């Protein structure tokens, strides 16, 4: 029996793998991946949609009506819409964020991509981001899927994380290290 009584990563993985296999079979993988990312962004950006998903008092009909409207507005792939309807009918829509994130991650892994996080103190141009991505691709001998964030609190420098490897050249980190040495002394 599972120690985790909640909806586990394994369960999310099963649903996402099922969606992946259906998408491959229907030859719509790229479209469904893009639409899944759109749904993830909608969950992040819309408090109303997040509430509809997370509030257990919302009934299936309300969720299905909202899904229908979202499907029309975003012109979602029919297979993805049916999959999301299935989640609603099985009372698993509460976990749609985990499931779709797992699906997008599965797509990346199947393409042989490594996920990388880049955070910089200054806004980087598209060209600078692409140059960093190319260097990471060379260094890790793998295709890189790069997520970029700007964080002025770093003061200067970059933080790059690929898998479990992290390089932090930020001034904020250097100041923190100096502070720690002074406390220890």
Swiss-Prot record:
GO terms for cellular component: plasma membrane; proton-transporting ATP synthase complex. Its main location: membrane. The keyword Cell wall biogenesis/degradation does not apply. Gene3D superfamilies: N-terminal domain of the delta subunit of the F1F0-ATP synthase. Pfam families: OSCP. NCBIfam families: ATP_synt_delta (TIGR01145). F(1)F(0) ATP synthase produces ATP from ADP in the presence of a proton or sodium gradient. F-type ATPases consist of two structural domains, F(1) containing the extramembraneous catalytic core and F(0) containing the membrane proton channel, linked together by a central stalk and a peripheral stalk. During catalysis, ATP synthesis in the catalytic domain of F(1) is coupled via a rotary mechanism of the central stalk subunits to proton translocation. This protein is part of the stalk that links CF(0) to CF(1). It either transmits conformational changes from CF(0) to CF(1) or is implicated in proton conduction. This is ATP synthase subunit delta. It comes from Pelagibacter ubique (strain HTCC1062). The lineage of its organism: Bacteria, Pseudomonadati, Pseudomonadota, Alphaproteobacteria, Candidatus Pelagibacterales.
